[in-house]
Amino acid sequence: MQCIETNNLQQLLEQVKPYTKKGKLATYIPELGNANPDDLGIAIFHKETEYIHAGNSQTLFTLQSISKVITLALALLDRGQEYVFSKVGMEPTGDPFNSIIKLETTSPSKPLNPMINAGALAITSMLAGKDNEEKMERILHFVREITDNPTINYSSKVANSELETAYLNRSLCYYMKQNGIIDCDIEELMDLYTRQCAVEVNCIDLARIGLIFAMDGYDPYKKKQIIPKHITKICKTFMVTCGMYNESGEFAIRVGIPAKSGVAGGIFGCVKGEMGIGIFGPALDANGNSIAGFKILELLSAQEGWSIF
């Protein structure tokens, strides 16, 4: 696959920049409403030639729902496939990511997949550790190892902002506790979940996460297996079917790679055996995806022939 050049990335960014005007910030988490909606950055981390980047690629932003892929991998390592999927399903849903509907109407009552909020909360409740400090340190260690960036931390400001307004997520937790999906203290779980969502990265970090998943968990620079191959395959399957909220089907048609988005404006994607892509554009479309980020991935996929379909 031919290498993309930095000036090509810069041209594509300029081409899609007008789309940022059509999107809106995620103001329901107050701290996210302080982002600059015009920001747009991209990085591509290749297995051989390191990375190229353009735009606001070194601006820090929080993982938000992108963290769901990280904690799913950790939970599978900690608990194994059989236990994890006894509590959380494997099917996509057409409902909003924070909906409670399927929990009420599906029997047995369990979240349909790990990429919706109910499923992600259940996954976080499975992480090993004696307390939240140990669990959060494990999450940070995992992200630092995948990104090869020991400075990565979380934003307590964003975590607190999210914790104060997370009424719907609390209701999902109480409903799941009633039905035996989770058995931990709800406020403890909410504290950990909001911190995992508030882990800060930039596009280069995100692209490196994408590279590790593109290489089935193998780090071509450290020359070691970081995540077991079978776990990355499970994660990437969910990224294809559920990774882009209610646009996952359209994204599969228009872009056709495993990807996961977050409401802070991040998207990471992976091109199997080749590269990872990290994007930041906090102006979101109606489904909660970076509007310009979606467009630049669509253009790159068409140009480079990335689609797995």
From Swiss-Prot:
Keywords recorded for this protein, A-Z: Hydrolase
InterPro entries: Beta-lactam/transpept-like, Glutaminase
UniProt superkingdom: Bacteria
Residues given in the record as substrate binding sites: 65, 117, 162, 169, 193, 245, 263
Enzyme Commission number(s) of this protein: 3.5.1.2
Top EC class of this enzyme: hydrolase
NCBIfam families xrefs: Gln_ase (TIGR03814)
Homology family: Belongs to the glutaminase family.
The protein's name in its UniProt record: Glutaminase
Originating organism: Bacillus cereus (strain 03BB102)
Gene name for this UniProt entry: glsA
